[in-house]
């Protein structure tokens, strides 16, 4: 049981080192985001960039148009 808890903690520490933005509370410009989570920082919105083929797979935080 203790080894399972240790493993979960180790995975969490590795993830927080690799993906600091996901633990900062909000996502910065051009960070990957999920539209329904509203996780981009103030002034940014989660949009799917259009790469010409009309199918941008990754959603990113971009500046909101005024």
From Swiss-Prot:
Signal sequence region: 1-24
Disulfide bonds listed in the record: 26-41, 33-46, 40-61
Subcellular location(s) per record: Secreted; Nematocyst
GO cellular component term, pick one: host cell postsynaptic membrane
GO molecular function annotation: acetylcholine receptor inhibitor activity; toxin activity
Entry keyword annotation includes Oxidoreductase: no
Keyword annotations: Acetylcholine receptor inhibiting toxin, Cleavage on pair of basic residues, Disulfide bond, Knottin, Nematocyst, Neurotoxin, Postsynaptic neurotoxin, Secreted, Signal, Toxin
Protein purpose: Alpha-toxins act on postsynaptic membranes, they bind to the nicotinic acetylcholine receptors (nAChR) and thus inhibit them. This toxin competes with alpha-bungarotoxin for binding to orthosteric sites on muscle-type T.carlifornicus (IC(50)=1080 nM) and human alpha-7/CHRNA7 nAChRs (IC(50)=14.13 uM).
Note: Negative results: does not show activity on rat TRPV1, human TRPV3, rat TRPA1 channels, the human ghrelin receptor, human neurotensin receptor 1, rat ASIC1a and ASIC3 channels.
UniProt domain comment: The presence of a 'disulfide through disulfide knot' structurally defines this protein as a knottin.
Record-given protein name: Alpha-actitoxin-Ms11a-2
Organism encoding this protein: Metridium senile
């Amino acid at each position: 049981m203790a080894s399972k808890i240790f493993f979960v903690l180790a995975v969490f520490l590795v993830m927080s080192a690799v993906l600091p933005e996901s633990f900062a509370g909000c996502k910065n410009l051009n960070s990957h985001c999920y539209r329904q989570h509203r996780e981009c920082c103030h002034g940014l919105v989660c949009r799917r960039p259009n790469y010409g083929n009309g199918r941008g797979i990754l959603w990113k935080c971009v500046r909101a148009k005024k």
